[in-house]
Design a protein with these regions (language model features):
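Structural preference for beta-strand elements that scaffold enzyme active sites
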Residues: 28-35, 75-81, 103-106, 130-136, ...
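Aromatic-lined carbohydrate-binding surfaces of glycoside hydrolases
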Residues: 1-17, 33, 37-46, 85-87, ...
């Protein structure tokens, strides 16, 4: 729903809760930032490429930018979780998002076929604009949330995932690149 809210009123209220919490905490106990995972590609308007998608994505971008500005005012980092396909489906939105809408992006790199190419543009933009980028690996079992075997490391194991991360670090050579797992429960089961 936040994708519809170009004024970012609801998003800003959530950020405000975190910022208000921080004001009551000693410096060392404060929350450093927030990550937003707004998924406009799950909405009906996304399917209407020519007619409705551009307006939806502009509203999404404006919401993100408003949230970023507010988070910065409240001394919070602001990261945005994105899929691997914005570079091909809406490249101008992706660039504006990285340039003007976040401190960093977290790319849901949930397809093992070509993990480098799937996030090459995102890393290129992050590097160009001095932003961070996180490569998120999926760990849930195939069959959950329409995941297929190729989307997850659940059956390949953590060693294969770590080899992938090492390879991406070497290929990208970008100090702003980090890695994360989706999510804690399946990670615990794999350890």
């Amino acid at each position: 729903e936040w994708a519809y809210d170009a004024q970012a009123e609801s998003l800003i209220k959530r950020i405000e809760r975190v910022a208000d919490y921080n004001e009551r905490q000693p410096q060392g106990s404060r929350i450093r930032g927030v990550m937003v995972d707004i998924e406009p590609y799950l909405l009906e308007e996304w399917k209407e490429k020519e007619t409705q998608r551009p307006g939806l994505m502009q509203s999404y971008l404006t919401c993100i930018q408003q949230g970023y500005r507010y988070a910065a005012q409240r001394d919070l980092e602001f990261w945005v979780c994105i899929p691997i396909f914005y570079d091909t489906s809406c490249p101008d939105i992706l660039e504006a998002l990285v340039r003007d809408g976040c401190d960093g992006i977290a790319v849901m790199n949930y397809n093992r076929t070509d993990e480098y190419a799937q996030m090459a543009k995102e890393v290129e933009l992050a590097r160009a604009y001095g932003k961070g980028v996180i490569c998120i690996y999926e760990l849930q079992q195939p069959g959950k949330h329409d995941l297929e075997e190729i989307n997850t490391y659940a059956n390949q194991g953590l060693e294969a995932l770590w080899q992938s991360a090492e390879g991406l670090e070497k290929q990208f050579q970008y100090d702003g690149l980090r890695f994360a797992y989706h999510y804690y429960q399946p990670l615990r089961q794999m350890l």
